[in-house]
A protein has these predicted regions:
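N-terminal Rossmann NAD(P)H-binding glycine-rich loop of SDR-like oxidoreductase domains
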Residues: 4-24
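Conserved Rossmann-fold NAD(P)-dependent oxidoreductase catalytic core, especially the SDR/UDP-sugar
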Residues: 70, 94-137
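C-terminal substrate-binding subdomain of Rossmann-fold SDR/epimerase-dehydratase oxidoreductases
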Residues: 186-300
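NAD(P)H-binding glycine-rich loop region in Rossmannoid oxidoreductase-like domains
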Residues: 51-88
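Short alpha-helical oligomerization interface
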Residues: 77-92, 126-134
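NAD(P)-dependent short-chain dehydrogenase/reductase
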Residues: 122, 147-202, 206-210, 239-246
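Rossmann-fold cofactor-recognition segment
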Residues: 41-53
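Active-site helix of classical SDR
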Residues: 137, 141-144
Length: 300
């Protein structure tokens, strides 16, 4: 049984990967700054530590995991784009990788972002083809970490894959994010005010994003991989799907807020590597994912 260490395991994405990893037969160890959560799947071993502290990586030396799945980062909505925390997480991530390599680690998968790409007016992102020119501190920090991590992996002979996350929605989403804002309003019968939602994006349901990362970890694929649905939609399609799932399409107020003029009109992902090399594709339709999302919000 291969031991995997998961960071960011209580986060929006990280929490969903635990059950797929257990189902795949991993010995799952998870890191959190708080005690083990009550919702934890049976079989996960929790370790309370703060990776931003200098001595935190001693845990890696003790556990000697063969695999590493690293999600932990500063992801506070509205703040993470410009947060100094991005720099702290670059430093912490490099300490983590050094400890992982020193402990005999074999394969690491780290979470990247679509914000590493150059966002033009319309951008279809293809690994190794689309220019990497991040416009934010968040994107630049992830981009810099990837370059250093890949060089480190080559030098220390461990495999490394980099999963670039695009746009995500689903249970446990922060109410300050698009999906969380709309779903939380609909769940209590409140008007969901949004922009016209004409921009095109690639949305992936959070539990499926977690499944994709578990599949990436279990594969032999290295380098950057877009982790997305490959099924771009206008933002308003997601918003309206949530409205229909809630049974309250009348509460959806498209155009009640102005669109951000700085956002690209279209930002989509090529998922050829994920589909053909990793062997993973999503199975839920947008409507199915919206129904599951609203069911969670209605019973939380």
């Amino acid at each position: 049984m291969s031991r995997v260490l998961v960071t960011g395991a209580t986060g929006f994405v990280g929490r969903g990967v635990l059950e797929p990893l257990l189902a795949a037969g991993y010995d799952v160890h998870a890191i959190s700054t708080r005690p083990a959560p009550a919702w934890s799947p049976e079989g996960v071993v929790w370790h309370q530590t703060d990776l931003l502290e200098l001595g935190a990586t001693s845990l890696v030396s003790e556990l000697r995991p063969a695999q590493l799945l690293h999600f932990a980062w500063d992801a506070e909505p509205g703040r993470f784009w410009i947060s100094e925390g991005n720099l702290h997480w670059v430093e912490a991530s490099l300490r983590l990788l050094r400890a992982f390599a020193a402990a005999g680690g074999e394969r690491a998968v780290l979470a990247g972002t679509s914000a590493e790409y150059a966002w033009e007016h319309e951008t279809h992102c293809v690994e190794g083809v689309t220019p990497l020119a991040p416009a934010t501190l968040y994107g630049a920090s992830k981009h810099a970490l990837r370059m250093i991590a890949e060089a480190h992996a080559r030098q220390h002979d461990y495999a490394l894959a980099w999963g670039r996350i695009f746009f995500v929605f689903g249970p446990f989403e922060d109410e300050r994010r698009l999906g969380g804002s709309v779903a939380s309003a609909l769940a209590v019968g409140r008007r969901a005010e949004t922009s016209p939602g004409k921009q095109v994006r690639d949305f992936l349901y959070a539990p499926e994003l977690a499944e994709a990362f578990a599949a990436l970890l279990g594969s032999d694929v290295t380098g950057a991989v877009n982790v997305a649905s490959g099924q771009p939609v206008a933002i308003k399609e997601l918003i309206c799907a949530l409205g229909e799932a809630a049974g309250r399409p009348d509460l959806v107020a498209l155009g009640a807020r102005a669109a951000n003029p700085l956002e690209p009109a279209s930002l989509t992902a090529d998922v050829g590597r994920l589909r053909d090399e990793v062997g993973w594709t999503p199975t839920r339709s947008l409507a199915e994912a919206a129904r599951e999302t609203m069911a969670w919000w209605s019973h939380r």
